[in-house]
UniProtKB/Swiss-Prot annotation:
Region spans: Coil 1A: 107-141
Residue ranges, annotated region (Linker 12): 253-269
SMART domains: Filament
UniProt-annotated stretches for the region Tail: 414-505
Name of the featured protein: Keratin, type II cuticular Hb1
Miscellaneous comment in the UniProt entry for this protein: There are two types of hair/microfibrillar keratin, I (acidic) and II (neutral to basic).
Length: 505
């Protein structure tokens, strides 16, 4: 009889076949950090009597293992065999009708676990990039710290420059103060000179008043003399008229009498000559007095005019000097005020620069402390990331070892099933969950039984079978709840328990 199955599209013949529907043996797990492994085996085999089934057990959380249909490679040469008709009757294989749904769910779970594994790989890469970024930041902050160490000498140099400028300003202020004192002394001298000139002017004015009084007296005398001259002239005129009247009267009295009298001419009184002489004398006196008064008055006026001009010129020069000194005093006062303001500004700038320098230094120290704290935090974060990365890598290494272990286990079990060996005891353990042990039985009519092992394991994964490859003895220790763990402490595969010489790790 020829029977077709879905094992890789190959056909084989058998005398009688009873077993589960064609499928694959799948052992899955939900390990630490979502890393999944999947192994499927397909193939066909031939035998006289095959009874297959599965029984699944779980221990702990997030672990589940299933197996259905264990297949081994077909013999190299298939011969024609006779078919027992009685074996064609339908058999009650006690197969769960929901096995296909469970397998589909397992496929989806494996896909999700693979996606999580890929996400964890991406996360590892991202953490490596973050590690590189933190190293770059650390290098940058170290270089920046080296660059910021030159700020303090710059601030000290700038403060020293400002101090030198302040000293120069103080020296200039001292020099300006000495110049101001000198100018004040000169001003005091000019004030004294001005006071002397004022006193001289007062004296000259007093002299002018006295001379004016003298001139007034001379003018009054001149007026008196002129009045006297006029009075004398009037008197002379009166006497002349009187003399003429008397002569006329005498002539009228003697007109009728002719008397010849001879007189001595030397005894005659010549009034005209006398009057002329007196008049000449008075005219000479008046002329001399007038000339003397006019000359004295002109000389005094010229002298007073010269004195007034001289004192006015001196007063004008003194006023100009006083104005010049006032302008110089104002200019020097403004310069002194400007120097004081500049000195105060420079002192304020020095104080502000010192405050800014102190603030900048404190800010730089705070930033340095913050950068050191950030660097320390970055180092701690990097150490945590490295630890997590090592844990992830350890988990990945354990899962890789699990995958390799499952592959070797399935290959060995497949070979043993093909050779027709009886019960197979499978024990799977993980450090993040419990242990599942299943007994796979391939016999004529024996049902499949399984046992659950919940004993803890030292490594990440431990898988053992109840059959020893060299000696063919059964390992019953897994059914009791213990698993073989290799000395490496990570994962081990124990096949059989007949002795230490047949255990494989």
């Amino acid at each position: 009889m020829t029977c077709g199955s879905g094992f890789g599209g190959r056909a084989f013949s058998c005398i009688s076949a009873c077993g589960p529907r064609p499928g694959r043996c799948c052992i899955t797990a939900a390990p630490y950090r979502g890393i999944s492994c999947y192994r499927g085996l397909t193939g066909g085999f031939g035998s006289h009597s095959v009874c297959g089934g599965f029984r699944a057990g779980s221990c702990g959380r997030s672990f589940g293992y299933r197996s259905g249909g264990v297949c081994g490679p077909s013999p190299p040469c298939i011969t024609t065999v006779s078919v027992n008709e009685s074996l064609l009757t339908p058999l009650n294989l006690e197969i769960d009708p929901n096995a296909q749904c469970v397998k589909q769910e397992e496929k989806e779970q494996i896909k999700s676990l693979n996606s999580r594994f890929a996400a964890f790989i991406d996360k590892v890469r991202f953490l490596e990039q973050q590690n590189k970024l933190l190293e770059t930041k650390l290098q940058f902050y170290q270089n920046r710290e080296c660059c910021q160490s030159n700020l303090e000498p710059l601030f000290e140099g700038y403060i020293e420059t400002l101090r030198r400028e302040a000293e120069c300003v103080e020296a200039d202020s001292g020099r300006l103060a000495s110049e101001l004192n000198h100018v004040q002394e000169v001003l005091e001298g000019y004030k004294k000179k001005y006071e002397e000139e004022v006193s001289l002017r007062a004296t000259a004015e007093n002299e002018f008043v006295a001379l004016k009084k003298d001139v007034d007296c001379a003018y009054l005398r001149k007026s008196d003399l002129e009045a006297n001259v006029e009075a004398l002239i009037q008197e002379i005129d009166f006497l002349r008229r009187l003399y003429e009247e008397e002569i006329l009267i005498l002539q009228s009295h003697i007109s009728d009498t002719s008397v010849v009298v001879k007189l001595d001419n030397s005894r005659d009184l010549n009034m005209d000559c006398i009057i002329a002489e007196i008049k000449a004398q008075y005219d000479d006196i008046v002329t001399r007095s007038r000339a003397e008064a006019e000359s004295w008055y002109r000389s005094k006026c010229e002298e007073m005019k010269a004195t007034v001009i001289r004192h006015g010129e001196t007063l004008r020069r003194t006023k100009e000097e006083i104005n010049e000194l006032n302008r110089m005093i104002q200019r020097l006062t403004a310069e002194v005020e400007n120097a004081k303001c500049q000195n105060s500004k420079l002192e304020a700038a020095v104080a502000q620069s010192e405050q800014q320098g102190e603030a900048a230094l404190s800010d730089a120290r705070c930033k340095l402390a913050e950068l050191e704290g950030a660097l320390q935090k970055a180092k701690q974060d990097m150490a945590c990331l490295i630890r997590e990365y090592q844990e992830v890598m350890n988990s990945k290494l354990g899962l890789d070892i699990e995958i390799a272990t499952y592959r070797r286990l399935l290959e060995g079990e497949e070979q043993r099933l093909c050779e027709g060996i009886g019960a197979v005891n499978v024990c799977v353990s993980s450090s993040r969950g419990g242990v599942v042990c299943g007994d796979l039985c391939v016999s004529g009519s024996r049902p499949v039984t399984g046992s659950v092992c919940s004993a803890p394991c030292n490594g990440n994964v431990a898988v053992s079978t109840g059959l020893c490859a060299p000696c063919g003895q059964l390992n019953t220790t897994c059914g009791g709840g213990s698993c073989g763990v290799g000395s490496c402490g990570i994962s081990s595969l124990g096949v059989g328990s007949c002795g230490s010489s047949c255990r494989k790790c």
